[in-house]
Regions:
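Active-site C-terminal subdomain of aminotransferase-like
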Residues: 14-15, 191-276
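Conserved PLP-binding catalytic core of the aspartate aminotransferase-like
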Residues: 284-315
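A glycine-/small-polar-enriched, mobile loop at the entrance of the PLP active site in fold-type I
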Residues: 2-61
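Conserved active-site segment immediately N-terminal to the catalytic lysine
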Residues: 179-191
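Active-site phosphate-binding strand-loop segment of PLP-dependent enzymes
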Residues: 116-172
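PLP-dependent enzyme catalytic core of the Aspartate aminotransferase-like
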Residues: 5, 332-361
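Conserved beta-loop-alpha segment that forms the PLP phosphate-binding cup at the N-terminus of a helix
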Residues: 54-83, 87, 91-95
Length: 361
């Protein structure tokens, strides 16, 4: 397997040496020892600060898709109704996933290069009256950031729906106040801004959501049941990953030492530099306007004189790895990940200079 000197894919991101150190030690029995539960509680508290929430934090093993499934299976009955707010691949994915559960799922859809219109979402919810509304904060394949979570959250509250938000690739790198947005279940992955491998999934869960979860009683592997009182009852539904939990603790403390405001500014500066350099070399931004671009990832059209496989191969030959794309964007749009450890001006500048050298041959 080849290692790339300059990693700018939009997750999993480069892992800092300080975080890697968590895997250099041996730990005890994580589901029995007080030391582990103390670490778990500290990570809960630090994550609440990161997300600006008082809601419960649940930290489970596995990649973030596991909690996207959990957020649906634990809150929807087969006769339930879900409204997926979609301006991209992952927004659509919520509806597709719900459909496999026998749920009545509708999509309030918007073009991939735009963001949701909160009035259209409100009107759709008023007529449909869903049990759950889902939204995606950062559509990573599109490089867009949804600015209207608070408006959608108010609509969800008005119509009695739970509000589920995928902020896997935005939390910690973008302005986000989960409680202000009335987010009932928020979904975060470890491999983006937190700069870990894809080993942990983190959910913020409101009391409203817990009531629904207890009523639905889904008990499969991804279930939130059993996690509500983990620190108090000193019991885990399965053996947790102590190494990953320690790595998460290191990551969260690194963020807090730097300061949340400074971390957000660092992401904004890296994004701004990436787009400025892209403009200078003639790259076209995929989002319709720079104002809806995410601070954590930038999506550019592949230059017309190149194919994506050609460009990707030439960049990798120079030691640079960036992100391709999925679905209808595959081969047409590529992405620069400047999140977490990669929100670094020198790293972004070096990577963009290599892109310049290859597209301007």
């Amino acid at each position: 397997m080849k290692n790339y000197r300059i990693g700018l894919i939009p997750g999993p991101v480069r892992i800092p040496e300080e975080i890697k150190s968590a895997w250099q030690n041996d730990y005890g029995s994580s589901d029995l020892e007080e030391e582990f539960f103390t670490l778990y509680r500290e990570n809960q508290s630090l994550t609440q600060k990161l997300l600006h929430t008082k809601n419960d934090i649940v930290i489970t093993s596995g990649e973030a898709m596991s909690i996207l499934w959990a957020s649906l299976k634990c809150t929807l009955r087969p006769c339930g109704k879900l409204l997926a707010v979609s301006s991209g691949l992952f927004g659509e994915g919520f509806a597709e996933m719900a459909g496999t559960l026998g749920v009545n799922a509708e999509i309030c859809t918007f073009p991939y290069d735009e963001v949701p219109d909160p009035q259209k979402v409100y009107d759709h919810a008023r007529i449909f009256r869903p049990d759950v509304i889902t939204a995606v904060h950062c559509e990573t394949p599109s490089g867009t950031l949804t600015p209207c979570l608070a408006e959608i959250g108010r609509a969800a509250r008005e119509f009695g729906a739970l509000f589920v938000v995928d902020f896997v690739s935005s939390a910690g790198g973008c302005e986000l106040d989960a409680d202000e947005c009335n987010i009932d279940i928020g979904l975060l992955g470890s491999q983006k801004v937190l700069s870990l491998p894809p080993c942990l999934s983190i959910s913020s869960i409101s009391q409203r959501a817990w009531e629904i979860i207890r009523g639905v009683k889904y008990s499969g592997y991804e279930s939130y049941l059993g996690w509500e009182n983990v620190p108090r009852q000193h019991f885990m539904p399965y053996t947790p990953d102590w190494h990953a939990m320690k790595a998460l603790n290191i990551s969260l403390n690194m963020i807090m030492r730097e300061g949340l405001t400074s971390v957000l500014e660092r992401h904004e500066e890296a994004a701004k530099l990436c787009r400025e350099l892209g403009r200078e070399m003639g790259l076209k931004l995929f989002p319709k306007s720079e104002g809806i671009s995410s601070p954590t990832v930038t999506a550019f059209y592949v230059p017309e004189n190149l194919t994506w496989p050609e460009l990707d191969a030439s960049l990798r030959a120079k030691g640079l790895a960036v992100g391709g794309n999925y679905g209808s964007l595959s081969g047409k749009v590529f992405r620069i990940g400047h999140m977490g450890s990669q929100a670094d001006l020198e790293l972004v500048r070096e990577g963009m200079n290599i892109i310049r050298s290859e597209i301007m041959k």
